[in-house]
Swiss-Prot record:
Active-site residues annotated for this sequence: H156 (proton donor/acceptor), K160 (proton donor)
Catalytic activity: (S)-2,3,4,5-tetrahydrodipicolinate + NAD(+) + H2O = (2S,4S)-4-hydroxy-2,3,4,5-tetrahydrodipicolinate + NADH + H(+); (S)-2,3,4,5-tetrahydrodipicolinate + NADP(+) + H2O = (2S,4S)-4-hydroxy-2,3,4,5-tetrahydrodipicolinate + NADPH + H(+)
Function per UniProt: Catalyzes the conversion of 4-hydroxy-tetrahydrodipicolinate (HTPA) to tetrahydrodipicolinate.
PROSITE patterns registered for this protein in UniProt: DAPB
Protein name as annotated: 4-hydroxy-tetrahydrodipicolinate reductase
Organism: Pasteurella multocida (strain Pm70)
Claim: Cytoplasm is one of the keywords in the record: yes
Protein location: Cytoplasm
List of residues binding NAD(+): G9, A10, G11, G12, R13, M14, E35, G99, T100, T101, A123, S124, N125, F126
EC number, UniProt record: 1.17.1.8
SUPFAM superfamilies xrefs: Glyceraldehyde-3-phosphate dehydrogenase-like, C-terminal domain, NAD(P)-binding Rossmann-fold domains
Protein's pathway: Amino-acid biosynthesis; L-lysine biosynthesis via DAP pathway; (S)-tetrahydrodipicolinate from L-aspartate: step 4/4
Length: 270
């Protein structure tokens, strides 16, 4: 059975990559494509916009008008928009793949609640490599975490609006959970002025925003005399797009529940 996917933010950098990934994936077709009200891209053919050829899918700003054209929605936009799309999907009983980052606790709670009704894959990063890194971080933290300083450094393009990145925060959460720590208590997100000595149980974050960096993350487990670094560099957004479409195909078999890429990739077996 062919899965019909809708993409919101279809005209953005990630949206165009998602359209391309859908067009390259067997068993998946683009059913609908959406942009914000007032966008100059409304009415354009989504395939032509993404340089994959004419698809006959016009970009619109009205989810309700296209509700019969898609089975699942992929959303890599902003929290306020994603939550509005989430409410629509719950009402229409359509599953969602959510790659949006920057949610506050209330937003995350709404996603959790929605998963009682529909299937949701919610992840800070859809790269297969990054999700493998999450498992490596857990193993490193188990062996070294209580005896070394842990620092997370991330870099992204100048247009990214949230910091630290959702991926960096997820890395911190995986480490903190392994060590029995609360990231809200032990995470250090700014250092300025006379900060005093570093506490051993801190998990530090550093953020870089520059140019067109797609996404780079490095985690240090630093002890006196040695340092282990676990790093990931993305050179194309296509890695995230392909992962999201892979998640969509996997989620098509689920009625409801909240999942992440660990579930999609079956990484709990490692």
């Amino acid at each position: 059975m062919t899965l019909r996917v809708a993409i919101v933010g279809a005209g953005g950098r990630m949206g165009r990559q998602l359209i391309q990934a859908v067009s390259e994936t067997e068993g998946v077709v683009l059913g609908a494509a959406f942009e914000r009200q007032g966008s100059s891209l409304l009415g354009a053919d989504a395939g032509e916009l993404a340089n994959v050829g004419h698809l006959g899918v016009q970009i619109t700003d009205d989810l309700a008008s296209q509700q019969d054209q898609f089975d699942l929605l992929i959303d890599f936009t902003r929290p306020e928009g994603t939550l509005a799309h989430l409410a629509f999907c719950v009402a229409q009983h359509k599953n969602m793949v959510i790659g949006t980052t920057g949610f506050d606790d209330d937003g995350k709670a709404k996603i959790q609640q929605a998963a009682d009704s529909i299937g949701i894959v919610f992840a800070s990063n859809f790269s297969v490599g990054v999700n493998l890194v999450f498992k490596l971080l857990e193993k490193a933290a188990k062996v070294m975490g209580d005896y070394c300083d842990i620092e997370i450094i991330e870099a992204h393009h100048r247009h990214k609006v949230d910091a630290p990145s959702g991926t960096a925060l997820s890395m911190g959460e995986h480490i903190a959970k392994t060590l029995g720590r609360d990231l809200k208590t032990h995470g250090v997100f700014t250092r300025d002025g006379i900060t005093g000595e570093r506490k051993r149980d801190e998990i530090g974050f550093a953020t870089i925003r520059a140019s067109d960096v797609v996404g780079e993350h490095s985690v240090w487990f630093a002890d006196i005399g040695e340092r282990v670094e676990i790093a990931h560099k993305a050179t194309s957004r296509m890695t995230f797009a392909k992962g999201a479409v892979r998640a969509a195909k996997w989620l098509a078999q689920k009625e409801k529940g909240l999942f992440d890429m660990t579930d999609v990739l079956d990484l709990n077996q490692l």
